[in-house]
């Protein structure tokens, strides 16, 4: 998809001031749109963000990735736990074995490293194999003991980009028609902690069924109402059909 100006701002704000910035790795090799309309290589962007080394993984060698690998398969042992940032800027939807792509992202991250997935959510028919639901990322990385799980719904319409914070654990479900005619993406991040077990993460059970049938305690209804009314419900129609989202 390339890294848009809005995506660059989301990456920078997510990185913030915390965490080491030694090595970053990306899925795919992408061009980055700048504010003055130019394009730069992704290595320049991540270098500006403080990373000393920027590596990449791709299936084909054409764009000169650092590692020519198939993300449908487990990544080699010598790459595991080595990266302070793992950035998937729209590769996962093109891989048939999407769960393994997420496992690989988790495996590549170092302790205290950050994983970011920026992938299609709605209105991307036939762009790749899949469009994704927010609960997939919260349930997978939650089950893998990652922390600081955050997501923004990223709206793209021509040259206008905007976003809304969203958390399926406390917010009510997003309407199926979210975004109207705009393209909608998930911008999700999670941090790997020392408590994350070594080896490949397992398969999660979807959160709604863990609470309905598995005895897991759900977030209280009052908390849902409070959070939802503050962030989503009060302006649902406006926000999802053209107004109220934060402009990038």
Kindly label every feature range from the protein language model:
Residues 22-31, 36-124, 135:
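Conserved SAM-binding loop
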Residues 1-22:
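Class I SAM-dependent methyltransferase Rossmann-like catalytic core
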Residues 3-6, 159, 238:
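A short alpha-helical cap/connector motif
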Residues 122, 128-155, 162-166:
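Conserved Class I S-adenosyl-L-methionine
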Residues 210-248:
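Membrane-proximal basic amphipathic "stem/tether" segments
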Residues 158-223:
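Flexible, glycine-/basic-rich loop-and-beta segments that form/coincide
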Residues 123-128, 174-178:
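Active-site rim elements
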Residues 10, 136-140, 189:
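Amphipathic alpha-helical segments that form well-ordered structural scaffolds
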């Amino acid at each position: 998809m390339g890294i848009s100006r809005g995506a660059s701002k989301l990456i920078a704000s997510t990185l913030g001031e915390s965490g080491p910035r030694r090595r970053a790795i990306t899925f795919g090799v992408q061009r980055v749109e700048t504010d003055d309309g130019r394009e730069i290589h992704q290595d320049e962007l991540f270098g500006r963000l403080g990373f000393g080394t920027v590596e990449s993984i791709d299936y084909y060698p054409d764009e000169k990735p650092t590692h020519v690998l198939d993300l449908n398969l487990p990544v080699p042992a010598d790459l595991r736990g080595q990266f302070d940032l793992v950035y998937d800027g729209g590769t996962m939807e093109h891989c048939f074995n999407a769960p393994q792509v997420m496992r690989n992202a988790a495996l590549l991250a170092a302790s205290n490293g950050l994983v970011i997935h920026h992938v299609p959510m709605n209105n991307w028919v036939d762009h790749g194999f899949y469009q994704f639901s927010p609960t997939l990322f919260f349930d997978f990385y939650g089950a893998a003991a990652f922390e600081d799980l955050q997501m923004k719904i990223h709206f793209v319409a021509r040259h206008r980009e905007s976003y809304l914070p969203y958390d399926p654990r406390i917010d009510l479900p997003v309407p199926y028609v979210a975004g109207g005619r705009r393209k909608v993406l998930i911008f999700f991040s999670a941090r790997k902690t020392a408590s994350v077990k070594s080896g490949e993460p397992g398969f999660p059970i979807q959160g709604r069924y863990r609470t309905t049938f598995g005895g897991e305690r759900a977030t209280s209804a009052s908390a849902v109402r409070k959070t939802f009314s503050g962030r989503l419900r009060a302006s649902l129609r406006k926000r999802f059909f053209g107004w109220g989202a934060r402009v990038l």
